[in-house]
């Protein structure tokens, strides 16, 4: 067996969404900060293509690269690679990374609770892991500051007419639309249609509304979050959502950055206040338990500090290799399973 490279991976999913973790075989990319390192990964694309494209990956897969932290407060850094983006932050991926770090012994587990500080490209995140019998059973992550950008903005979408949307940042950038406006329900049988419509809405929002982070070089809207109405029971709000990820797939989890974004919009509209909780439910029925911890300011904008809580499970280990005679060193994409991102 011969190979010009061997990449060691621990497989993982958080509430249904794949978030595999590279634990060896890749040197840290160049960059003075984790953000700069993530920009190198995004622009170079060599590693992204190798691990995400067929025959080694697929549109369903997200992969995280562990890197030494740049911030002295952090114990580990990580860079997130999604099908079309290399984002600042991801809730499900941070839960996967935390679980792999503890379950594999890379960071020592303390029962019943382990506290960690990790460094995502978008900033420092604080992690609290509930642990028992050698397993990280639930991960709570303090996400980066989240804020609403545009509220109730009109958006013209081909085939849908004019719809009203919100744009918001929850660790990544979203356009949010109510499912009823587009004549859809969030259920597994409509996954393909939801994904395709969501990508179309994202494209229209980038063309007509745009987005710019006040502190990061992040100048586009990444995702469309499709929501159903929120219900309230005391100080707990519950809402079903699904996020369309380019090129056209649905997040299987409730989307941690999406839940953070939704809480930011609810707060901006006066429908949620500090200390209240939000349960986000996915298209699979899995849940993230979240809290609007406090209100703050980011770059002159009102913002919130959200906490996301969910579970993840290790699914296996693997080694990705490249035989020198392989005709597809960068992999390939076919539109039968990798929809065209138009």
UniProtKB/Swiss-Prot annotation:
InterPro entries: Pro_racemase_fam. One of its GO terms (molecular function) is trans-L-3-hydroxyproline dehydratase activity. Signal peptide: none annotated. Belongs to the proline racemase family. This is Uncharacterized protein BCAN_A0346. It comes from Brucella canis (strain ATCC 23365 / NCTC 10854 / RM-666).
């Amino acid at each position: 067996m011969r190979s010009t490279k061997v990449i060691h991976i621990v497989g993982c999913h958080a509430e249904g969404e794949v978030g595999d973790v590279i634990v060896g075989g890749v040197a840290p990319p160049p960059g003075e900060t984790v953000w700069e390192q993530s920009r190198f990964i995004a622009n170079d694309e060599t590693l992204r293509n190798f691990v995400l494209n067929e025959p080694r990956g697929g549109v369903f897969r997200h992969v995280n690269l562990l890197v030494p932290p740049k911030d002295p407060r952090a114990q580990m850094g990580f860079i997130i690679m999604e099908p079309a983006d290399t984002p600042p932050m991801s809730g499900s991926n941070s839960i996967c990374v935390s679980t792999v770090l503890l379950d594999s012994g890379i960071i020592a587990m303390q029962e019943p609770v382990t506290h960690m500080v990790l460094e995502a490209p978008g900033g420092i995140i604080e992690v609290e892991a509930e642990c028992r019998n050698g397993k990280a059973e639930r991960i709570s992550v303090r996400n980066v500051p989240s804020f609403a950008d545009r509220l109730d903005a009109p958006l013209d979408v081909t085939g849908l007419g004019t719809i009203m949307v919100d744009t918001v940042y929850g660790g990544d950038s979203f356009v949010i639309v109510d499912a009823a406006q587009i004549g859809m329900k969030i259920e597994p049988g409509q996954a393909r249609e939801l994904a395709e419509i969501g990508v179309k809405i994202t494209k229209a929002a980038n063309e007509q509304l745009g987005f710019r982070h006040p502190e990061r070089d992040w100048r586009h809207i990444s995702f469309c979050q499709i929501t159903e109405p929120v219900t309230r029971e005391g100080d707990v709000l519950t809402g079903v959502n699904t996020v369309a990820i380019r090129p056209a797939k649905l997040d299987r989890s409730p989307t941690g950055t999406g839940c953070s974004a939704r809480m930011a919009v609810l707060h901006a509209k006066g429908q949620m206040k500090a200390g209240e909780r939000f349960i986000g439910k996915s298209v699979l029925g899995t849940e993230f338990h979240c809290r609007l911890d406090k209100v703050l300011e980011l770059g002159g904008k009102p913002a919130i500090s959200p906490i996301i809580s969910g579970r993840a499970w290790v699914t296996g280990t693997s080694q990705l290799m490249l035989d020198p005679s392989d005709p597809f060193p960068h992999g390939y994409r076919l539109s039968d399973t990798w929809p065209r991102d138009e």
